[in-house]
A protein has these predicted regions:
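Short, well-ordered beta-strand elements
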Residues: 43-47, 67-79, 99-106, 127, ...
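Conserved C-terminal helix/tail region of periplasmic/extracytoplasmic solute-binding proteins
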Residues: 393-446
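A structural signal for short loop-to-beta-strand junctions that line the ligand-binding cleft
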Residues: 118-119, 123-126, 154-186, 211-215, ...
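Extracytoplasmic/periplasmic substrate-recognition and gating elements
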Residues: 93, 304-367
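Extracytoplasmic/periplasmic solute-binding protein
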Residues: 170-176, 182, 201-247, 289
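Extracytoplasmic "Venus flytrap"/periplasmic binding protein-like
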Residues: 90, 94-157, 189-194, 290-291
Length: 446
């Protein structure tokens, strides 16, 4: 991080708000802080920030506070509350010499974050987590404040995550994770690594063990694999900026892919279950499940349930008209955004930057199994030697970016996925093609 660039950015912001606080600082802050009581009790280090840089940020916060307390609300998912609270307390301690900072950490599902920010921005959180596909919606509603540290974010994170966080060349959010996707998880005592290479092999193992394979076919985030594997690709929006644009796909190939999944599910109806991804870890725990498709947010629970028998791999192949075809899925990122109507924009920006720095990303990797977007963190031995993170990173080669998706994208996919898991439905080529065409038309709102 370049000290001069931070200084220039913060001074420019301070001048804009009429605050002329000096950014020299008294050097009283340290590069390691202890989380306050009520959190996890573990230190959150900030080794990537020098004391001079912390002092500059502290003076900016002090100037914004103007002798009063700064109060901010943070939204994050339920699974991350303990870690988020610990990091929030560490942030307060880091800048305690400069201002009285009150941070409220509240549960807010990331999938609904954008809607709640847009519906009532003044009552919403100042800093919040959200998935990459919601960036366009938030930006179009002018709900996001542009990042104050674009050059630093670009230098710290992978190029792909920064590109996904940008609109028209402007960085609009702080990359938090580089793993918003899903992989195959399995019980290694029941499913061999070789069987895990193909969906047919996975079902073969499930049948032998008399146990389930679970995936959430009623969720468009997972259902999209049926279309993507057949060659359909999302390519942003049409000229109107709203209608989903697709590549020049072959409807026959897409239909063949969808039919292959439907036929395989039907043939293995006794061992296939469509359920929320939390059911995968629960199934491992109670001994009813041999394999499943789990989101990155469920990996820690899978590891807890299976221990040394936890297996992780990229999504398997599926046989389509005699050809083993790699399953293609959706891969996205999680971001932390700053509410454009925050009463304390400078402190909110520094907080968002802090929560996404290398050290905080590494703590989430260690505690939550969230793979980082930070390039240095990705290069750490911990991440490189982590089987689930390695599988998630490898899956990116076979994924479509979770960006620039229309608001109409999800419901038609969910309907298609629900249709496919009912064994009594008509899965003739003609019937499947009609469902595929209806799904695509629904996504395009035609």
């Amino acid at each position: 991080m370049k000290t001069r660039k931070i200084l220039a950015l913060l001074m420019a912001v301070l001048m804009l708000v009429g605050c002329l606080a000096a950014c020299g600082g008294d050097g009283g802050s340290t590069t390691e802080t202890q989380a306050a009581s009520g959190s996890t009790g573990e230190a959150v280090v900030t080794e990537s920030w020098t004391e001079e840089q912390i002092a500059q940020m502290g003076e900016a916060i002090k100037g914004e506070a103007g002798g009063s307390a700064v109060s901010l609300k943070i939204w994050g998912p339920e699974l991350a509350q303990d870690v988020l609270k610990s990091q929030a307390e560490a942030f307060k301690a880091l800048f305690a010499d400069y201002a009285d900072i009150n941070l409220e950490v509240a549960v807010q599902g990331e999938n609904d974050a954008a809607a709640n920010i847009i519906n009532d921005p003044k009552a919403a959180a100042d800093v919040f987590g959200f998935p990459s596909d919601q960036l366009t919606k938030l930006n179009n509603a002018n709900a996001l404040a542009e990042c104050y540290f674009p050059e630093n974010v670009t230098a710290d994170n992978t190029a792909a995550s920064v590109a996904a966080a940008s609109v028209d060349g402007k960085v609009m959010a702080y990359p938090e994770t580089g793993d918003n996707s899903y992989i195959l998880v399995y019980d290694k005592s029941l499913v061999s690594d070789e069987q895990a290479k193909s969906l047919e092999g996975v079902f073969e193992a499930c049948e032998a063990a008399k146990k389930k394979f679970i995936m959430d076919s009623g969720n468009g985030f997972f259902t999209c694999m049926y279309l993507y594997t057949g060659g359909l690709v999302t390519e942003g929006f049409e000229e109107d900026g709203m209608t989903q644009k697709f590549n020049d796909y072959d409807i026959n190939q897409v239909t063949a892919s969808v039919k292959a999944f439907a036929d395989l599910f039907t043939a293995n109806k006794d061992y296939f279950e469509s359920a929320d991804t939390t059911a995968v870890a629960d199934g491992f725990k109670n001994g009813t499940t041999a394999a499943g498709i789990a989101g990155s947010w469920n990996i820690a629970a899978v590891k807890e349930a299976l221990g040394d028998n936890a297996g992780f791999a990229i999504l398997p192949t599926i046989n389509i008209n005699g050809t083993d075809t790699q399953i293609i899925n959706m891969f996205g990122y999680k971001f932390i955004g700053v509410n454009s109507q925050s009463a304390y924009p400078i402190t909110a920006q520094i907080l968002a930057y802090y929560l996404t720095n290398e050290d905080c990303q590494m703590q989430r990797a260690e505690k939550l199994d969230w793979a980082p977007s930070n390039a240095a963190a990705q290069d750490s031995d911990f991440v490189k030697n982590n089987a689930s993170m390695s599988a998630l990173m490898a899956q990116t080669e076979f994924s479509i970016p979770q960006t620039a998706l229309a608001g109409t994208f999800w419901d038609p996919l969910a309907a298609l996925g629900t249709y496919m898991i009912e064994p009594t439905n008509d899965f003739s080529t003609e019937a499947v093609q009609a469902e595929v065409e209806a799904c695509i038309a629904g996504i395009r709102d035609e």
